Protein backbone atom coordinates (compact mmCIF):
# COMPACT_ATOMS: atom_id res chain seq x y z
CA UNK A 1 0.00 0.00 0.00
CA UNK A 2 1.10 3.53 -0.82
CA UNK A 3 -0.08 6.39 1.43
CA UNK A 4 -0.33 9.73 -0.38
CA UNK A 5 -0.45 13.22 1.14
CA UNK A 6 -4.04 14.51 0.63
CA UNK A 7 -2.53 17.74 -0.72
CA UNK A 8 -1.39 15.77 -3.78
CA UNK A 9 -3.58 14.44 -6.60
CA UNK A 10 -4.11 10.69 -6.39
CA UNK A 11 -4.46 10.05 -10.12
CA UNK A 12 -0.74 10.13 -11.07
CA UNK A 13 0.04 7.40 -8.55
CA UNK A 14 -3.13 5.33 -8.95
CA UNK A 15 -2.77 5.22 -12.75
CA UNK A 16 1.00 4.72 -13.01
CA UNK A 17 1.16 2.17 -10.19
CA UNK A 18 -2.06 0.31 -10.95
CA UNK A 19 -1.54 -3.37 -10.32
CA UNK A 20 1.59 -2.70 -8.24
CA UNK A 21 0.28 -0.78 -5.25
CA UNK A 22 -3.00 0.06 -3.59
CA UNK A 23 -2.80 3.88 -3.44
CA UNK A 24 -4.72 5.54 -0.59
CA UNK A 25 -4.98 8.82 1.27
CA UNK A 26 -5.33 6.97 4.57
CA UNK A 27 -5.03 3.46 5.97
CA UNK A 28 -7.14 1.78 8.59
CA UNK A 29 -5.25 0.67 11.71
CA UNK A 30 -5.53 -2.98 10.72
CA UNK A 31 -3.93 -2.12 7.34
CA UNK A 32 -0.82 -0.44 8.79
CA UNK A 33 1.41 -3.45 8.09
CA UNK A 34 0.61 -3.20 4.36
CA UNK A 35 2.01 0.33 3.95
CA UNK A 36 5.38 0.25 2.17
CA UNK A 37 5.79 3.89 1.15
CA UNK A 38 4.71 7.39 2.20
CA UNK A 39 4.33 10.21 -0.34
CA UNK A 40 4.38 13.82 0.84
CA UNK A 41 4.57 17.31 -0.63
CA UNK A 42 5.48 19.50 2.33
CA UNK A 43 4.15 17.59 5.35
CA UNK A 44 7.04 16.74 7.70
CA UNK A 45 8.01 13.07 7.89
CA UNK A 46 10.14 11.69 10.70
CA UNK A 47 9.99 9.10 13.45
CA UNK A 48 6.44 9.96 14.54
CA UNK A 49 5.01 9.72 11.03
CA UNK A 50 6.60 6.39 10.10
CA UNK A 51 6.25 4.68 13.49
CA UNK A 52 2.69 3.38 12.84
CA UNK A 53 3.85 1.66 9.64
CA UNK A 54 6.55 -0.94 10.38
CA UNK A 55 6.77 -2.05 6.75
CA UNK A 56 7.62 1.35 5.26
CA UNK A 57 10.61 1.05 2.93
CA UNK A 58 10.53 4.41 1.16
CA UNK A 59 9.48 8.04 1.54
CA UNK A 60 8.91 10.17 -1.54
CA UNK A 61 8.64 13.94 -1.33
CA UNK A 62 7.21 15.65 -4.40
CA UNK A 63 9.43 18.67 -3.97
CA UNK A 64 12.92 19.86 -4.77
CA UNK A 65 13.80 20.34 -1.12
CA UNK A 66 13.95 17.78 1.69
CA UNK A 67 14.23 20.06 4.73
CA UNK A 68 10.82 18.85 5.97
CA UNK A 69 12.14 15.27 6.21
CA UNK A 70 14.16 13.91 9.11
CA UNK A 71 16.77 12.36 6.84
CA UNK A 72 18.95 11.12 9.67
CA UNK A 73 16.06 9.28 11.31
CA UNK A 74 14.83 7.79 8.04
CA UNK A 75 18.33 6.61 7.21
CA UNK A 76 18.69 5.08 10.69
CA UNK A 77 15.53 3.08 10.04
CA UNK A 78 16.79 1.94 6.63
CA UNK A 79 14.07 3.88 4.80
CA UNK A 80 15.01 5.12 1.34
CA UNK A 81 14.22 8.72 0.40
CA UNK A 82 13.36 10.03 -3.05
CA UNK A 83 12.55 13.57 -4.19
CA UNK A 84 11.81 15.43 -7.43
CA UNK A 85 14.81 17.77 -7.68
CA UNK A 86 14.83 18.67 -11.37
CA UNK A 87 11.24 18.95 -12.59
CA UNK A 88 10.93 22.75 -12.28
CA UNK A 89 14.49 24.06 -12.60
CA UNK A 90 13.67 26.04 -15.74
CA UNK A 91 10.47 27.48 -14.30
CA UNK A 92 12.16 28.73 -11.13
CA UNK A 93 15.02 30.25 -13.12
CA UNK A 94 12.50 32.01 -15.37
CA UNK A 95 10.55 33.28 -12.36
CA UNK A 96 13.71 34.56 -10.70
CA UNK A 97 14.85 36.39 -13.83
CA UNK A 98 11.39 37.92 -14.28
CA UNK A 99 11.55 39.23 -10.71
CA UNK A 100 15.05 40.65 -11.19
CA UNK A 101 14.14 42.42 -14.43
CA UNK A 102 10.84 43.72 -13.05
CA UNK A 103 12.70 45.05 -10.02
CA UNK A 104 15.30 46.85 -12.11
CA UNK A 105 12.57 48.44 -14.22
CA UNK A 106 10.47 49.21 -11.13
CA UNK A 107 7.39 47.51 -12.57
CA UNK A 108 5.56 46.64 -9.37
CA UNK A 109 6.19 49.96 -7.63
CA UNK A 110 5.30 51.94 -10.76
CA UNK A 111 2.11 49.95 -11.21
CA UNK A 112 1.09 50.63 -7.62
CA UNK A 113 1.86 54.33 -8.03
CA UNK A 114 -0.30 54.64 -11.15
CA UNK A 115 -3.20 52.84 -9.49
CA UNK A 116 -2.86 55.31 -6.60
CA UNK A 117 -3.17 58.26 -8.99
CA UNK A 118 0.50 58.99 -9.55
CA UNK A 119 2.16 59.48 -12.92
CA UNK A 120 5.61 60.96 -12.32
CA UNK A 121 7.99 58.06 -11.57
CA UNK A 122 9.96 58.18 -8.33
CA UNK A 123 11.76 54.93 -9.08
CA UNK A 124 15.19 54.79 -10.73
CA UNK A 125 14.92 52.52 -13.78
CA UNK A 126 17.92 50.48 -14.78
CA UNK A 127 19.48 49.28 -18.01
CA UNK A 128 19.98 45.52 -17.87
CA UNK A 129 23.42 45.28 -19.47
CA UNK A 130 24.82 47.81 -16.99
CA UNK A 131 23.85 45.70 -13.97
CA UNK A 132 25.44 42.93 -11.94
CA UNK A 133 23.45 39.92 -10.74
CA UNK A 134 24.75 37.99 -7.75
CA UNK A 135 23.57 34.39 -7.47
CA UNK A 136 23.83 32.58 -4.14
CA UNK A 137 23.78 28.87 -4.94
CA UNK A 138 24.95 27.81 -8.38
CA UNK A 139 23.23 24.45 -8.70
CA UNK A 140 20.68 23.45 -11.34
CA UNK A 141 18.50 26.53 -10.87
CA UNK A 142 21.26 29.04 -10.23
CA UNK A 143 23.14 27.91 -13.34
CA UNK A 144 20.05 28.24 -15.50
CA UNK A 145 19.45 31.73 -14.14
CA UNK A 146 23.07 32.67 -14.86
CA UNK A 147 22.77 31.56 -18.49
CA UNK A 148 19.57 33.51 -19.01
CA UNK A 149 21.01 36.65 -17.43
CA UNK A 150 24.25 36.51 -19.39
CA UNK A 151 22.27 36.23 -22.63
CA UNK A 152 20.93 39.72 -21.82
CA UNK A 153 24.42 41.11 -21.27
CA UNK A 154 24.13 41.11 -17.48
CA UNK A 155 27.34 40.70 -15.48
CA UNK A 156 26.91 37.59 -13.32
CA UNK A 157 28.85 36.61 -10.21
CA UNK A 158 28.17 33.73 -7.86
CA UNK A 159 28.89 32.52 -4.36
CA UNK A 160 28.84 28.76 -3.83
CA UNK A 161 31.28 26.69 -1.78
CA UNK A 162 30.15 23.45 -3.44
CA UNK A 163 30.40 24.15 -7.17
CA UNK A 164 33.98 24.30 -8.42
CA UNK A 165 35.38 27.59 -9.65
CA UNK A 166 35.53 27.96 -13.41
CA UNK A 167 32.12 26.45 -14.12
CA UNK A 168 30.93 28.11 -17.33
CA UNK A 169 33.35 30.97 -16.69
CA UNK A 170 31.11 32.51 -14.03
CA UNK A 171 33.17 34.54 -11.55
CA UNK A 172 33.18 33.25 -7.96
CA UNK A 173 33.28 35.86 -5.24
CA UNK A 174 32.87 35.89 -1.48
CA UNK A 175 29.43 36.43 -0.01
CA UNK A 176 30.50 39.85 1.25
CA UNK A 177 31.69 40.93 -2.20
CA UNK A 178 28.56 39.57 -3.86
CA UNK A 179 26.28 41.48 -1.49
CA UNK A 180 28.19 44.75 -1.69
CA UNK A 181 28.62 44.86 -5.49
CA UNK A 182 25.48 43.25 -6.94
CA UNK A 183 22.54 45.27 -8.24
CA UNK A 184 20.34 42.24 -7.62
CA UNK A 185 20.84 39.17 -5.44
CA UNK A 186 18.95 35.94 -6.12
CA UNK A 187 18.92 33.12 -3.57
CA UNK A 188 18.97 29.49 -4.71
CA UNK A 189 20.07 27.56 -1.64
CA UNK A 190 18.33 24.87 0.43
CA UNK A 191 16.88 25.62 3.83
CA UNK A 192 18.16 24.00 7.01
CA UNK A 193 15.90 23.75 10.08
CA UNK A 194 17.31 25.47 13.14
CA UNK A 195 20.03 27.36 11.27
CA UNK A 196 20.08 31.21 11.37
CA UNK A 197 19.10 33.00 8.14
CA UNK A 198 21.80 33.04 5.49
CA UNK A 199 20.94 36.70 4.97
CA UNK A 200 20.34 38.23 8.37
CA UNK A 201 20.23 41.86 9.41
CA UNK A 202 24.01 42.29 9.04
CA UNK A 203 24.09 40.76 5.56
CA UNK A 204 21.10 42.82 4.36
CA UNK A 205 22.89 45.94 5.61
CA UNK A 206 25.91 45.06 3.47
CA UNK A 207 23.90 44.91 0.25
CA UNK A 208 24.51 47.56 -2.39
CA UNK A 209 22.19 50.54 -1.94
CA UNK A 210 19.22 50.35 -4.31
CA UNK A 211 19.68 46.63 -4.99
CA UNK A 212 16.89 44.11 -5.56
CA UNK A 213 16.63 40.92 -3.49
CA UNK A 214 14.93 37.80 -4.87
CA UNK A 215 14.15 34.72 -2.75
CA UNK A 216 12.31 31.84 -4.38
CA UNK A 217 14.00 29.18 -2.25
CA UNK A 218 13.06 29.09 1.44
CA UNK A 219 11.67 31.83 3.68
CA UNK A 220 14.05 30.75 6.45
CA UNK A 221 17.05 31.88 4.37
CA UNK A 222 16.23 35.56 4.87
CA UNK A 223 15.39 37.79 7.83
CA UNK A 224 12.12 39.17 6.47
CA UNK A 225 11.88 41.94 9.04
CA UNK A 226 15.36 43.15 8.08
CA UNK A 227 14.31 43.20 4.42
CA UNK A 228 11.18 45.20 5.22
CA UNK A 229 13.24 47.68 7.24
CA UNK A 230 15.70 48.04 4.34
CA UNK A 231 12.85 48.66 1.89
CA UNK A 232 11.27 51.24 4.19
CA UNK A 233 14.61 53.01 4.54
CA UNK A 234 15.25 53.01 0.80
CA UNK A 235 18.35 50.86 1.20
CA UNK A 236 16.79 48.26 -1.11
CA UNK A 237 14.71 49.29 -4.11
CA UNK A 238 12.76 46.05 -4.26
CA UNK A 239 12.40 42.54 -2.90
CA UNK A 240 10.56 39.65 -4.51
CA UNK A 241 9.56 36.53 -2.60
CA UNK A 242 7.81 33.36 -3.69
CA UNK A 243 8.03 31.94 -0.16
CA UNK A 244 6.86 33.27 3.20
CA UNK A 245 7.22 32.33 6.84
CA UNK A 246 3.56 31.25 7.03
CA UNK A 247 1.83 30.25 3.81
CA UNK A 248 -0.57 31.70 3.04
CA UNK A 249 0.34 34.85 4.98
CA UNK A 250 -2.22 36.43 7.28
CA UNK A 251 -4.24 39.08 5.48
CA UNK A 252 -3.36 41.59 8.21
CA UNK A 253 0.41 40.94 8.06
CA UNK A 254 1.73 44.53 7.92
CA UNK A 255 4.78 43.43 5.93
CA UNK A 256 2.55 42.78 2.92
CA UNK A 257 1.93 46.53 2.58
CA UNK A 258 5.63 47.37 2.25
CA UNK A 259 6.42 49.49 -0.80
CA UNK A 260 8.73 47.64 -3.16
CA UNK A 261 7.79 44.18 -1.88
CA UNK A 262 6.44 41.62 -4.36
CA UNK A 263 5.05 38.35 -3.02
CA UNK A 264 3.84 35.55 -5.29
CA UNK A 265 2.00 32.50 -3.87
CA UNK A 266 4.77 29.86 -4.08
CA UNK A 267 4.22 29.31 -7.80
CA UNK A 268 7.76 29.69 -9.11
CA UNK A 269 7.72 25.98 -9.95
CA UNK A 270 4.51 26.12 -11.96
CA UNK A 271 3.88 25.43 -15.64
CA UNK A 272 1.95 22.74 -17.54
CA UNK A 273 5.28 21.17 -18.45
CA UNK A 274 6.48 21.08 -14.85
CA UNK A 275 3.15 19.67 -13.70
CA UNK A 276 3.72 16.65 -15.93
CA UNK A 277 7.43 16.44 -15.15
CA UNK A 278 6.97 16.13 -11.38
CA UNK A 279 4.56 13.24 -11.90
CA UNK A 280 7.05 11.36 -14.08
CA UNK A 281 9.96 12.14 -11.76
CA UNK A 282 7.98 11.13 -8.68
CA UNK A 283 6.97 7.74 -10.06
CA UNK A 284 10.48 6.99 -11.31
CA UNK A 285 12.04 8.07 -8.01
CA UNK A 286 9.61 5.99 -5.97
CA UNK A 287 10.30 2.86 -8.00
CA UNK A 288 14.05 3.31 -7.58
CA UNK A 289 13.70 3.95 -3.84
CA UNK A 290 11.62 0.80 -3.37
CA UNK A 291 13.96 -1.45 -5.33
CA UNK A 292 17.40 -0.13 -4.34
CA UNK A 293 19.33 -2.39 -1.99
CA UNK A 294 20.63 -1.06 0.29
CA UNK A 295 18.20 1.86 0.32
CA UNK A 296 19.42 5.07 -1.25
CA UNK A 297 18.69 8.28 0.63
CA UNK A 298 18.84 11.95 -0.22
CA UNK A 299 21.77 13.56 1.54
CA UNK A 300 21.00 16.52 3.81
CA UNK A 301 22.50 19.74 2.50
CA UNK A 302 22.86 22.75 4.73
CA UNK A 303 21.99 26.25 3.57
CA UNK A 304 25.69 27.01 3.95
CA UNK A 305 26.33 24.47 1.18
CA UNK A 306 24.18 26.45 -1.27
CA UNK A 307 24.00 24.30 -4.41
CA UNK A 308 20.59 22.81 -5.24
Task: Describe every region a protein language model picked out.
Residues 45-47, 161-254:
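Rossmann-like adenosine-cofactor binding region
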Residues 85-132, 144-147:
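Phosphate-binding beta-alpha-beta segment of Rossmann-like dinucleotide-binding domains, i.e.
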Residues 1-37, 305-308:
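N-terminal glycine-/charge-rich "phosphate-binding" loop or analogous flexible N-terminal tail
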Residues 6, 138-139:
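Glycine-rich Rossmann-fold phosphate-binding loop(s) that bind the pyrophosphate
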Residues 210, 216-308:
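Rossmann-like dinucleotide-binding domain for NAD(H)/NADP(H)
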Residues 27, 62-63, 79-90, 160, ...:
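Short beta->alpha connector loops at strand-helix junctions that form conserved
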Residues 2-3, 133-135:
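Hydrophobic Val/Ile/Leu positions in short beta-strands of Rossmann-like dinucleotide-binding domains
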